[in-house]
Amino acid sequence: MEVKIEETDWDEGVPGISFLKDAFSREEISPPKDDKNRKKEEVRMKLESGEYSVVYRCPTFDEILNENGQKIDLVQCKNCFGFLSARTGGHMKNHKNQRCKPLNGPPEKKPKLDPQVVGNLQNHILDFVTESGVSLNIAESEKFRIFIISMIITGNPNVNVDEHQFLSGEWIRKTMKEKSCQYLDNIGAELKDPVSKGDACLILDYGRQLDDTFSIFVSYTNRSSGYFSLRVIPLAFTPLFEKKITEKTLDYILHATDRVGLPKEHVLKLKVVAEGATNMLKLGEYFDNCNLFTVCLSFSSKMCRKSFRSTETVEKFDNFIRKITCESDRKRNRNLWNDFLQTPALQSLINIYVLSLILLCFQLTEQLSRTPAQSRANEWLASYHCARDILHVFPQIADLKDDRIEPLVDELRQCKGVLEDCFEIFSLFENPLKLLEQPEQQIQNVAGVMFELYAQLDRIYIKAVDPKQPKECLAAVAKMAKLSIAHYTKITVTDVHLICAFLSPDSKNLKNFPAPKKNKAYRIVNTLMKDVVVPPPSLSQPILSPLLMAIKNDPSPIPTVSQEFNDYVQLVVSSKDATLAPLEFWAKYQERFPRMSEIAAKNFCVMSSPGVCGPSFIVLRSLFRVDRHSKFPDTTELMMISYLMANELK
């Protein structure tokens, strides 16, 4: 028998079954049975002498067998050191599982896992699947099963886990659904009281945060522990397969609330916050409280920034001006708009950008005290700063003797005064937009910022139309900006914004609000206070001394609506209280203002809920596939709810 000796570069793996490379030639006739022991002994001797090369059991063992099957004749068991045929078959099973007779004695009988240990292990595996957000495809896979078994054997090599089938994919899916149903029962029990009292708020997202998914959260202010805390509970993540219609949206809501045991008549009395589809506005026909609390725009500050941003090119600078004027306002003021388009201001803005490019490309900026800005961290400031820098160094540019810029300089010289008037308007937007971009900016302060900007524009407009010193271009730009701000505040600043602005400790005076808006806020709060039922004060408080008993033998009377309202209006907020979050402020003063604290808890729940849902959406997008092409959409929805409830990431 000819034996070919070859070196190998395969790495050693875990103990198991190894095989011999080129141990026997396939061209030889298989030895008879009585010669097998002699052949095995011969192989052992040549292994000890190093004549045969050995490759140990490794993760790619089966692949190596398939690729090199014709070169491999025998495999050797690392437990009993017996030689087996390399052909596939059931003769390797006992050797792979190490049930064969060891070289030094009979196989050791390994103990089984204790049933209590198995139960604990099952619970830990289920908790891992729930809290980690791992997909069921991974949890059901054979690789995950092998991983768990290998970890058990690593911790205790003398335990038998092969007979336990607790890691099957069917078991994981079934148990996962059972635990998800427990979470739904807990959600129903938690929401029963706030929903029945009308203190909760529905938060709807129609595919804006999660593509092709209708998301439903329920929020309420928890006041049971003495301080106010906002709770946001996930209710449903329904994949969308049909057209967006209001009736179907209502069916989604009622199905999700019925699943957790919330009655329909209580659900239809809740306040609604919605994003993602214009037909959500029609939900007011079905929900009772949408007359007062219509759909609240949850991204007001973000929308405000987008409404006034421009691109980095001055060719689109007139789009910046068009953007701050709504279509309906332009139709009513078409003559004013056409007069502005006929002014040389727009063409001059384009000339400014061309001039800045020429100065930069031909390196003519060395003689200037300031280089025209081409970009800014805030895109809405890029074109504005570029034009402002050109106007600032215009005298120096005019002194440059260059044929490439002289025509542009002559045209800009004629319109320089008009452009300066226009930028007087544009500069007003800088501070409000910077204020709105601050991360700590609260949404209830957006209305005050917009009203203050409107007042500034109104003063500029009155000054521009003064017959003694008229400025037609400045008046046109100021008038269009006023119309834009008025339109924005009309559709954005709802009654909820007015209530929250009045009940915020740092803006309770409503100093930037116009008189009609301020009076409306007062009127709404007074109306809501009359509907609040204040419970009688508790008489069970212990009296520590006879002196206190004599002083406080009767509970303090409950203030009337007018007394409580006037007390809050005249309240001087300390610097410390002004820094408190609104819910913290009202938790501190809930005994002094019992009615207003309840109104604040309900309305700040409406105002703050969409922002609190943001972290949940971010995590769900990164962990779950929530589109309509998901293989198991119902199971995915249950896993998303279970994940949020298990991690309290709401």
From Swiss-Prot:
SUPFAM superfamilies: Ribonuclease H-like (SSF53098). This is Uncharacterized protein ZK1098.2.
